[in-house]
Amino acid sequence: MRVVFMGTPEFSVPILTAIIGHGYEVVAAYTQPPRPAGRRGLELTRSPVHEKAEQFGIPVFTPKSLKGAEEQDVFASLEADVAIVVAYGLLLPKAILDAPRLGCYNGHASLLPRWRGAAPIQRAIMAGDAETGMMIMKMDEGLDTGLVAMAEKVAITPDMTAGELHDRLSMIGADLMIRALGALERESLALQPQAEEGVTYAAKIDKAEARIDWSKPAKDVHNSIRGLSPFPGAWCEMEINGAVERVKLQRSTLGEGSGAPGTVLDDRLTIACGEGAVRLATLQHSGGKPLPAQEFLRGQRVTKVL
């Protein structure tokens, strides 16, 4: 079976690796173009999928768009049986969707129709969902509206971070995709329509959302911290040894106590919220590495959280 793989971030890599490892012929990998990196933006960094595909000698294509006739002709010339799409980042026009003999199949990190869109992992945690999952669907022209081929549910534990859920769903996605490809080869892949009720959209995370609002209930603050960890990272300003510093918050738990929002309630960094309190467990100085709260506080006194 001739496969075109389309993906960009680290989340996509285990699925690509599994497809290669199970002997499928990956004739091309499509991924986002290299991005400027480094302090001055002078270096170009290739995507994780780009790096992995090159390790296996797979031709890599990095178009900025697939809307043009020339790019669509190149794609069609690959004569793919199927395209596998996992967090690619570009919209696929109808000409691309129709080119592979068996269609295009997408690995999506939610239980559709909940959390259609760009940031389903973060949004599920930020909303306080108790479960999510991984789905394989046959793509159509809508935004994550295609027929569902396979799904697996995953519990979201109370302190689970987006990073932990990301890794879990990525591995589940690899297993599901291999099972889906096998069923597709055997012509036994059953497709079901998504439910019409319960549609929500996982909008891309806005930078403004990363700043913690201590006037919100503790549960919402805790969900924001873990939903934005490790990237982009929730943050706040702290008064440390008399100076105000921006600090990233990577882990937290629900704490006990109350007070004016932003009040430091004890020497274990329990912070009062609009309702209840949150204990900060892992913090990160600007330009530093994540540290457990006890180590973060060594030689430092936090008097106020803004």
From Swiss-Prot:
Catalytic activity: L-methionyl-tRNA(fMet) + (6R)-10-formyltetrahydrofolate = N-formyl-L-methionyl-tRNA(fMet) + (6S)-5,6,7,8-tetrahydrofolate + H(+)
Transcription among keywords: no
Keywords tagged on the record: Protein biosynthesis, Transferase
Catalytic EC class: transferase
Entry-linked NCBIfam families: fmt
Role of this protein: Attaches a formyl group to the free amino group of methionyl-tRNA(fMet). The formyl group appears to play a dual role in the initiator identity of N-formylmethionyl-tRNA by promoting its recognition by IF2 and preventing the misappropriation of this tRNA by the elongation apparatus.
Name assigned to this protein: Methionyl-tRNA formyltransferase
Organism: Brucella suis (strain ATCC 23445 / NCTC 10510)
